[in-house]
Structure formats: structure tokens, C-alpha cells
Design a protein with these regions (language model features):
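Hydrophobic beta-strand positions that form the internal "hydrophobic ladder"
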Residues: 129, 173-177
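Short beta-strand->alpha-helix linker/helix-N-cap micro-motif
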Residues: 1-54, 65
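Amphipathic beta-strand/beta-sheet edge segments enriched in Tyr/Trp
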Residues: 49-113
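Residue-level detector of Asp-centered blade-edge/turn motifs that repeat once per structural unit
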Residues: 121-125, 171-172
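Multi-bladed beta-propeller domains
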Residues: 148-165, 191-203
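Hydrophobic beta-strand positions in blades of beta-propellers and related beta-sheet-rich domains
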Residues: 80-82, 144-146, 176, 188-190
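A flexible loop/linker signature enriched in serine peptidases of the S9 family
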Residues: 122, 134-143, 159-162, 179-189, ...
Length: 203
């Protein structure tokens, strides 16, 4: 696996650590990254000039990620840089913007950027999944959910006593379509995610 150190700049460290914990979890979940415990690091560089590449080679560290969060008028901004230890160079400098209460989404987007920079393959942490659950202890036993790729930030779209099958996303991911048997026969519905509004394709 790629051996990566993730470091939060001093200052707004608590909020930065919250987002970086999402980045760390996303990358570990791929099975392709080993994330260092910061307590075991010899130093916590804040800038490129602070990096002593020799000590990082002693730790067998492949890459260093240094990140910082700043509050903006519109929300929060995560700035991060990735350094290649073997080649002693910066390989990425990016900024990701988000809403203050959507720090998880910010972390997912950042982890996708880190993953692609290091592996050359686009990440999937910022994508969403959709699934149907079935329970036997209630009348509304079929439920359609969407969630982040890690299964968190779950959002219920529909409850029904009848089966819900074949859910699919619209091209822009703002709507979903599915087959529901709530009227007694198979019927295709399209539903807006943001508003919950839906309509039947077959009248």
C-alpha cells in the first residue's frame, strides 16, 4: 500500500482534523493506503520548506498531505498539498469549497483528489449509493435510501408497503427513477432528491 502521512496545519486544527479524518477513512477503505499515526511522526511540517525529506524516507513514507481549513463568506475552504517523498517534490496543490455543515462531503471530494493524484485512477468516495431495504416488522416494510459511498449520511426517499425495485439515477444525479407496486401494479416513478416531489411516468 501507499504510505501516507496526513497533517493538519496549526490554527483551525480541530475543524481541519474533522475533515481529514474523513479523508483518512476513505483512503484506508480502499485497501491501497497505509495512514501514519501522527503520534509516531518525527515532525509535523506546516509548509513545503519545513519538510526534511530524509527523515520521511527513514519512516518509509511515500507521500505527505498537508491541509488547512479556512472559513469563507460562502462556507469553508479546504486547501491541501501533496508531496512525493522519493522525488522530493510537490505533486498537487488544490482547494475544495463546501458548506460548513457538509464537512463530510468536503472530505470525500478531497480524498478523491488525493486518490487520483497518487494512483492515477479517479476516486469514488464522493459518489452516492442507492438501495432498498426490507423489514418484516412494519406496514411500510420497503424503504428506498440514498447515502454516501461509505454508507453514512443516509437519506430516506420513500417508504412503501409494496415492493420497490430497479432504482436508477438520472444523468445529473438530481433525480431517481424506480418501479413501485404501491398502486397494485408495476408503475415507474421519477422523484426529485432535493424536494421529494415525484410523479408517475405511466398514468
Amino acid at each position: 500500500p501507499y504510505r501516507l502521512a496526513i497533517i493538519a496545519k496549526e490554527g483551525n486544527q480541530k475543524q481541519t482534523q474533522k475533515v481529514l479524518s474523513i479523508v483518512s477513512q476513505d483512503l484506508k477503505r480502499t485497501g491501497e493506503f497505509y495512514i501514519f499515526d501522527n503520534k509516531l511522526l518525527l515532525s509535523l511540517p506546516q509548509t513545503e520548506e519545513d519538510i526534511e525529506y530524509r527523515e520521511w524516507r527513514l519512516l518509509n513514507c511515500d507521500f505527505i498531505l498537508i491541509a488547512d481549513i479556512q472559513e469563507t463568506v460562502a462556507g469553508i475552504q479546504l486547501s491541501y498539498e501533496i508531496f512525493d517523498v522519493a522525488n522530493k517534490e510537490k505533486i498537487r496543490s488544490s482547494k475544495v469549497y463546501g458548506i460548513t455543515d457538509r464537512f463530510r462531503q468536503l472530505g470525500h471530494y478531497a480524498s478523491d483528489g488525493v486518490y487520483e493524484t497518487i494512483t492515477g485512477i479517479p476516486g469514488i468516495a464522493s459518489t452516492r449509493i442507492m438501495y432498498v431495504t426490507q423489514t418484516s416488522d412494519s406496514k411500510s416494510k420497503f424503504q428506498l435510501f440514498i447515502a454516501d459511498a461509505d454508507g453514512l449520511n443516509e437519506q430516506l426517499l420513500l417508504r412503501s408497503s409494496e415492493p420497490i425495485i430497479s432504482p436508477v439515477w438520472s444523468p445529473d444525479s438530481s433525480k431517481v427513477a424506480y418501479v413501485s407496486f404501491e398502486t397494485g401494479v408495476a408503475n415507474v416513478f421519477i422523484q426529485e432528491i432535493a424536494t421529494g416531489k415525484r410523479f408517475s411516468v405511466i398514468n
